[in-house]
Amino acid sequence: MKFGVVVFPGSNCDADCFHVLKNVFGRETVYIWHKEDNFDVDCIVLPGGFSYGDYLRAGAIARFSPVMKKVVEFANAGGLVIGICNGFQILLEAGLLPGAMLRNKSINFRCHDVYLRVENNNTPFTSKAHEGQVLKIPIAHGEGNYYCEPDTLKKLIANGQVVFRYCNSRGEVTEDANPNGSLYNIAGIINEKGNVLGMMPHPERCSENILGGEDGRVIWESIIAYLERGANRG
């Protein structure tokens, strides 16, 4: 089992993801530089940060980097891909997930803990959670206001592609619990095949008690369990 953490110019959460996978979970993990187009891993992590300075818009330039051609091929072949924060934005720009990110409704950068409700635990990324489980995970973004067309939203809901929604500590999905104005309180979605996840909150920042919480562990544990079953391809 081997994880690859992609490093773009401007990434700043790559080391966090690498640390959690390699040192907390003891899994073989390598960095993948944005210019690389030849690598062999079982799961690709697109980390948070400000790839290419977020010029034009978040993820717009990163999606044209050499590594993304390989990431798209990997995903289309059934490989697991998780995009966190800026990584989610890049997945949207690359067309691996539907929709787009807008500026936060408040126009402010938001950096604090939020609550997420697990809407679908029948995915490679949430199998160790239970449906309706509430997770406390931090966010740090200025463009996390997810948007898609009404027909796309209906399809996401019908297909179970909405994986996480912002909620309060009791698991109630409310407007007050939404930190950025995201449509339908969406915090994370998967593609139709179920092998590509994009989420705005940072599970790598709450996978050790020393950081104040471990709710993010369930996502990494789910991925590891899926890969251990040998079902990551096809």
UniProtKB/Swiss-Prot annotation:
UniProt subcellular location: Cytoplasm
Q: Which Gene3D superfamilies does the record associate with it?
A: 3.40.50.880
User: PROSITE patterns under this entry?
Assistant: GATASE_TYPE_1 (PS51273)
Known catalysed reaction(s)? N(2)-formyl-N(1)-(5-phospho-beta-D-ribosyl)glycinamide + L-glutamine + ATP + H2O = 2-formamido-N(1)-(5-O-phospho-beta-D-ribosyl)acetamidine + L-glutamate + ADP + phosphate + H(+); L-glutamine + H2O = L-glutamate + NH4(+)
Keywords tagged on the record: ATP-binding, Cytoplasm, Glutamine amidotransferase, Hydrolase, Ligase, Nucleotide-binding, Purine biosynthesis
Q: Which SMART domains match?
A: GATase_5
Q: What is this protein called?
A: Phosphoribosylformylglycinamidine synthase subunit PurQ
Organism phylogeny:
Bacteria, Bacillati, Bacillota, Clostridia, Thermoanaerobacterales
Gene name in the database record = purQ
